Amino acid sequence: MEYILIFISAIFVNNIVLSQFLGICPFLGVSKKVETAMGMSAAVAFVLTIATIVTFLIQKFVLDVFDLGYLQTITFILVIAGLVQMVEIILKKVSPALYQALGVFLPLITTNCCILGVAILVIQKDYDLLTGVVYAFSTALGFGLALVLFAGLREQMSLVKIPKGMQGTPIALITAGLINLSLCSLLLSI
């Protein structure tokens, strides 16, 4: 039951982008096309889940054992950077089109505060490994859901005339807020 609550909460209620405001840069930057958003979501899901496992193990079996907690942030960043490099190499071989579409945003996963934030939150909330993985994967699904919905809406908005003062970031942030309201109201209606 606890896993179901974590799953639903991380996707809908405490969405990492829409409620906790982590990962806004890729959310706004890679959300112009649904196809690109789906690719970015998959890459973030992979890196986020694997990074949570690796950082959890490093925290419990290295940093805590040797009382090196002050190295947590830099260690986690290095782990995330290594995983992103691995994803970049794999995508370049497997899907060159997606690799090109993601462009500069793929290496920027390294600095995506969503991934570092989740790795640190798992430690701060004192989750065990399985609970941490469920939380990380659910958070990745929530990030992906928000990103794909937002990309779909931005594709539709590109077809209509938007007043000059609302174009770009203003309408994007209003749309993100409406997505958050709709996800929260969906849960309230159940």
Residues of each region from the PLM?
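Helix-coil boundary and interhelical linker segments in multi-pass alpha-helical membrane proteins
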Residues: 1-5, 57-70, 120-131, 187-190
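Ordered, amphipathic secondary-structure segments that act as subunit-interaction surfaces
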Residues: 60-103
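C-terminal ends of transmembrane helices
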Residues: 22-36, 84-98, 150-161
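Hydrophobic core segments of alpha-helical transmembrane domains in multi-pass membrane transport
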Residues: 6, 13, 44, 49-53, ...
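Structural signature of hydrophobic alpha-helical transmembrane segments
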Residues: 3-18, 67-82, 133-146
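C-terminal transmembrane helix-loop-helix hairpin of multi-pass membrane proteins
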Residues: 5, 129-190
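Generic transmembrane alpha-helix signature in multi-pass membrane proteins
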Residues: 21-29, 88-93, 104-106, 113-126
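Cytoplasmic-side transmembrane-helix entry/capping segments in multi-pass membrane proteins
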Residues: 35-46, 70-76, 98-109, 163-171
